[in-house]
Amino acid sequence: MPRSIKKGPFVDDHLLKKVKEMNKSNKKQVIKTWSRRSTILPDMIGHTIAVHDGRKHVPVFITEDMVGHKLGEFAPTRTFRGHGDHTERSTSLK
């Protein structure tokens, strides 16, 4: 269920503060954050935000298409290494 329009999109205050400071000074540095729950706003376009995935920070370059989505959508937390192969023992049991 989407968030109420009267409340507006959720963004952590510390992240929004960093983005606004970067926009004022026209700097483009990587912003490290653990806030996967924050919504991407138009102010963030062009910035690179390193989103934590549980082990490391994944750099995410923000584009126009990402506005309205959450930061966590672009930093997957699980790595799929494939299903197990058939061993000699498992095939001989059949």
UniProtKB/Swiss-Prot annotation:
Signal peptide: none annotated. GO terms for biological process: ribosomal small subunit assembly; translation. Protein S19 forms a complex with S13 that binds strongly to the 16S ribosomal RNA. The keyword RNA-binding applies. The lineage of its organism: Bacteria, Bacillati, Bacillota, Clostridia, Natranaerobiales. This is Small ribosomal subunit protein uS19. Keywords: Ribonucleoprotein, Ribosomal protein, RNA-binding, rRNA-binding. GO terms for cellular component: cytoplasm; small ribosomal subunit. GO terms for molecular function: rRNA binding; structural constituent of ribosome. Belongs to the universal ribosomal protein uS19 family. Pfam families: Ribosomal_S19. The keyword Ribonucleoprotein applies. It comes from the Bacteria.
